[in-house]
């Protein structure tokens, strides 16, 4: 099963967890992640990479994250698309700023099952302990 996330969804762990609990083995992310001129480009890139690896690790899923490159008005999009495995390992990536490229990786979906069995991420959850996560802000 493939789950889809759009851009900013990546910043919210609940979205990825919900898809994983529904049986997703692979999360596909399409994003326009970048930074404004006054923002630190290194920080924006670090956030992007951290979110991808965190969603893969915390849910024991593959994440294929595609990010836009180029400029629009004053906003800069840096690319850095990547495929990450259920243990957070990078399977493939496209260097920053590369235009119109693609990455290919062979994904063993059995690795998702094995990782989940080993780490017990879903079984050890304690939903009553964090009911506030589903309350409106």
At which residue positions do the language-model features occur?
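Active-site mouth loops of central-metabolism enzymes
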Residues: 4-6
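Cysteine/selenocysteine-centered motifs that mediate thiol-based redox chemistry or coordinate metal-sulfur cofactors
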Residues: 18-21, 111-137
């Amino acid at each position: 099963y493939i789950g889809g996330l759009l851009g900013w969804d990546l910043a919210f762990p609940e979205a990825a967890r919900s898809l994983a609990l529904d049986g997703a083995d692979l999360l596909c992310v399409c994003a326009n992640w970048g930074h404004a001129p006054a923002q630190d480009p290194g920080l924006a890139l670090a956030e992007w990479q951290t979110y991808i690896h965190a969603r893969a690790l915390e849910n024991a899923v593959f994440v294929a994250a595609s990010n836009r490159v180029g400029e629009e008005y004053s906003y800069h999009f840096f690319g850095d698309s990547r495929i990450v495995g259920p243990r957070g390992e990078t399977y493939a990536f496209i260097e920053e700023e590369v235009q119109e490229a693609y990455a290919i990786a062979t994904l063993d979906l059995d690795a998702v099952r094995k990782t989940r069995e080993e780490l017990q991420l879903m079984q050890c959850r304690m939903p009553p302990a964090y009911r506030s996560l589903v309350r409106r802000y």
